[in-house]
């Protein structure tokens, strides 16, 4: 019997598998396909990402440095409002490579990471969980037993449903695609032209340029995306689509199952990004969850919320600005634009002494 079976080997799942294995637990991590595929997420992250990967992987993963963002209330021809820092705000990285690097870290720590394993069902018992999985290229199913199961299988989590846990508050429909021309620009472009969210353009160095957006269900994201790329006069390829969970549910644990990452809605409400929040929650889980102690799941539940709830709550407030009337948005952007002292993962840093000093100057 395993101490933990981890379902899904994205950033949150790989991080937890690594940390739990480093603690000495027997960990099995199952990925339904190939780690990192298909791509369904941007690779624009804060520089904190380098705290989670080996130093020798940085050169391979790194694509571009970002120092600021141009905000628009219209298309690229509209007036731009530049928000910037003199130091790097964020980096653009190889998103598929990140997943594979984190999975390799879990393997080196001692976790058994298996690709091509799709979990088809679980059954909780007082002292363990039965897990059933299909294996690519094989008939029938394979059974595993674990003391605890970590559901890290994304926004449309099969494990969450099987465990009877509630859904995230909202799921946006995100799309992105790429052009191939090199672009080493040091700022991203953000367009407040999408209902209740935004569209973006991210220069990825030699890897090309990423165009994307997210919108609530019911909005025609394809038409919105075509409008974005038409405004820039580009044709894209490698089109990707996926759900973006916004708002964690009231609980992400049962007696022997817990959720991490997108499956738990552990994302930034104002950007939809969840890589750092998911790995932060994974560290909380690894610190507090003990496979022989169902009560420790309650400690994890409290710990991750205490760590992230303020940022998630403030992120919701920022997102409300996306729905303000355009004239109000223009005034707000004009007043706030310039040098900033805000951390892109921590909206509470808007009230930091550093940011307020720069804002007032």
Describe the function of each predicted region:
Residues 3, 145-147, 256:
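Conserved acidic residues
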Residues 5-9, 15-41:
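Glycine-rich FAD pyrophosphate-binding loop
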Residues 8-13, 147, 261:
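Conserved phosphate-binding and hydrolysis motifs of nucleotide-dependent enzymes
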Residues 32-75:
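N-terminal FAD cofactor-binding segment of flavoenzymes
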Residues 58, 64-65, 70-162, 172:
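Conserved N-terminal helical subregion
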Residues 121, 217-292:
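FAD/FMN-dependent oxidoreductases across multiple families
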Residues 156-222:
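Conserved FAD-binding catalytic core of PHBH/FMO-like flavoproteins
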Residues 290-361:
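C-terminal helical "tail/cap" subdomain of flavin- and related membrane-associated enzymes
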């Amino acid at each position: 019997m395993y101490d933990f079976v981890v379902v899904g080997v994205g950033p949150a799942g790989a991080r937890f598998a690594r940390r739990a294995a480093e603690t000495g637990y027997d960990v099995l991590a199952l990925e339904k396909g190939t780690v990192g595929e298909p791509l369904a997420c941007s690779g624009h992250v804060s520089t904190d990402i380098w705290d989670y990967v080996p130093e020798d992987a940085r050169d391979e993963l790194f694509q571009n440095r970002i120092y600021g963002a141009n905000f628009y209330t219209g298309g690229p021809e509209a007036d731009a409002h530049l928000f910037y820092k003199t130091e790097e705000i964020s980096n653009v990285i190889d998103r598929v490579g990140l997943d594979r690097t984190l999975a390799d870290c879990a393997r080196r720590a001692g976790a058994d990471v298996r690709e091509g394993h799709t979990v088809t069902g679980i059954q909780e018992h007082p002292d363990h969980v039965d897990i059933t999985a299909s294996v690519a290229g094989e008939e029938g199913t394979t059974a595993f037993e674990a003391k605890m199961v970590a559901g890290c299988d994304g926004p449309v989590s099969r494990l969450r449903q099987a465990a009877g846990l509630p859904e995230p508050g909202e799921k946006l429909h995100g799309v992105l695609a790429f052009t191939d021309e090199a672009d080493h620009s040091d700022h991203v472009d953000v367009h407040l032209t999408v209902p209740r969210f935004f569209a973006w353009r991210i220069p990825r160095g030699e890897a090309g340029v990423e165009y994307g957006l997210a919108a609530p269900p019911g909005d025609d994201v394809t038409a919105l995306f075509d409008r974005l790329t038409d405004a820039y006069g580009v044709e894209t390829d490698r089109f990707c689509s996926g759900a973006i969970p916004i708002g964690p549910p009231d609980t992400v644990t049962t007696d022997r199952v817990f959720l991490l990452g997108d499956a738990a809605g552990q994302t930034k409400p104002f950007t939809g990004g969840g890589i750092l929040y998911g790995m932060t929650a994974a560290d909380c889980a690894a610190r507090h969850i003990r496979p022989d102690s169902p009560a420790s799941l309650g400690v994890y539940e409290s710990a991750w919320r205490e760590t992230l709830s303020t940022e998630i709550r403030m992120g919701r407030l920022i997102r409300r600005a996306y729905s303000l009337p355009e004239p109000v948005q223009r005034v707000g952007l004009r007043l706030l634009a310039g040098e900033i002292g805000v951390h892109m993962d921590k909206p509470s840093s808007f009230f930091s002494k550093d940011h307020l000093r720069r804002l007032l100057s």
